[in-house]
Design a protein with these regions (language model features):
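Non-transmembrane, aqueous-exposed alpha-helical and coiled segments at domain scale
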Residues: 1-424
């Protein structure tokens, strides 16, 4: 038996989905332990290209049981749309290979409305929400003003609970934002259209996981986004509304006593970011556009162009410390092949002093990157499958990053395909 978490080290979009897809061949269960449909994992395999937002990445592997844990923001509408799209591409999804925690709270229709209304109110002070309802959902969850997926199995209790929440929520919609209220008929129609579709997948996943653990099954846990978007340890307030770090994995998965034997942190060979907030190494203009095009840096959920720049050693080292990573997967090394020199942010300058420490969020906008560079390799490496066959300059770059971040780089990806990963 082993428990392994795969997590993002930076701002998200590091390539976690394809790493889970790769290593899940050796695992029996994959659990998504936090977040909602506001970010995506991209996986390329024999069925095609998939942008997964809520479904665990193990859904693309036969024989793997996939679980949406109690820490997930369960958006029935988005989940069913995603399930339908994946099934249309030839992937089977049944209650045998997808299980939804009865303790996962439901993202309700008004959560999206409130997200958009608040972003509009904030105007130029907005945080860059994806408008998927995530912040209003988690706010309601911690106010105990939402419902659990398991309540869909008990309709009479569900309607009584929803009626009380509806009255309270309409006060916010009408009196704070001047928006249209919801009715019970609206909610019943929503449950009939989307809630009923996911009911066959809802069960006591905690009991399932405890049994799997007792049987010595291998369990993988995955999250969305990265360390710098964690609610407590990220660049607040430009974070998501949940804890993405590996320490939360046992709690959000439904197996709170689990010990993590391995934590694989995923780092991109350069930096990218979607949304607002400080991004010390950001490039602009032609330089940024060239890297963005080379890496296909557009949000899997929103399609928005990602902000890009060179690898940030300071932020990466901090992200690894937050996650407690035991191994690193360095992704998209091949994207850098067009560069004559590979730029690296080695340190920050803050208040006239150079520092290796990641600053407190309030002063991070004042940090300036201190740059260095290494020779590029200027050749296609997408077909390389052995470490020793990489150009010397590429190996030197990987080894430099490894030394600076203080964690072994076990995996190096050189392309989007399932087999385009070098294991060191």
């Amino acid at each position: 038996m082993s428990n392994c978490a795969i997590v993002g080290i930076n701002w998200g979009d590091e390539g976690k989905g394809r790493m889970v897809d790769l290593v899940t061949a050796d695992y029996d269960v994959v659990v998504r332990y936090q977040g909602g449909g506001n970010a995506g994992h991209t996986v390329v395999n024999e069925f095609g290209k998939f942008a997964l937002h809520l479904l665990p990445s193990g859904i693309l592997r036969k024989g793997v049981v996939n679980i949406l844990g109690n820490g997930v923001a369960l958006d029935c509408e988005s989940l069913w749309t995603e399930m339908s799209d994946v099934m249309d591409q030839g992937v089977a999804i049944t209650p045998e290979n997808l299980k939804i925690s009865d303790r996962a709270s439901l993202l309700l229709p008004w959560h999206r409305d409130l997200d958009s209304l608040e972003e509009a109110r904030l105007a130029d002070k907005k945080y860059g929400s994806t408008k998927q309802g995530i912040a209003p959902f988690y706010s309601d969850k911690y106010q105990k003003k939402t419902i659990m997926a398991g309540e869909l199995l008990y309709p009479e209790k569900l309607w009584d609970h929803l009626a009380g929440i509806l009255e309270w929520k309409n006060l916010t919609l009408e009196r704070v934002y001047g928006a249209k209220p919801y009715t019970m008929d609206d909610l019943k129609a929503w449950v009939a259209e989307f809630g009923e579709k996911i009911k066959p997948f809802i069960c006591d996943t905690g009991a399932f996981l405890r049994q799997a653990q007792a049987e010595g099954k291998h369990i993988r846990l995955e999250a969305q986004l990265g360390s710098l978007r964690d609610l407590d340890y990220g660049i607040y307030p430009y974070t998501t509304s949940s804890n993405v770090i590996a320490a939360y994995a046992p709690v959000g998965s439904g197996l709170p006593t689990a010990k993590l034997d391995k934590i694989i942190g995923v780092v991109k060979a350069y930096s990218s970011c979607v949304g607002e907030g400080p991004f010390p190494c950001e490039w602009f203009g032609e330089e940024a556009e060239k890297l963005r095009e080379a890496g296909g840096e557009y949000g899997a959920k929103t399609g928005r162009p990602r902000r890009v720049g060179p690898i940030d050693i300071v932020a990466t080292r901090y992200g690894i410390q937050c996650q407690g990573a035991t191994d690193i997967a360095l992704t998209k090394l091949d994207v850098l092949s067009y560069m004559d020199e590979i730029p690296i942010c080695a340190r920050y300058e803050l208040s006239g002093q150079e520092t290796d420490a990641f600053p407190f969020p309030a002063v991070l906008p004042d940090a300036k990157p201190v740059m260095t560079a290494m020779p590029g390799w200027k050749c296609d490496i997408s077909g390389v499958r052995k470490w020793e066959n990489l150009p010397e300059a590429a190996r030197n770059y990987v080894e430099y990053v490894e030394r600076e971040i203080g964690c072994h780089i076990t995996y190096v990806s050189v392309g989007p395909e399932r087999d385009s990963i070098i294991i060191r």
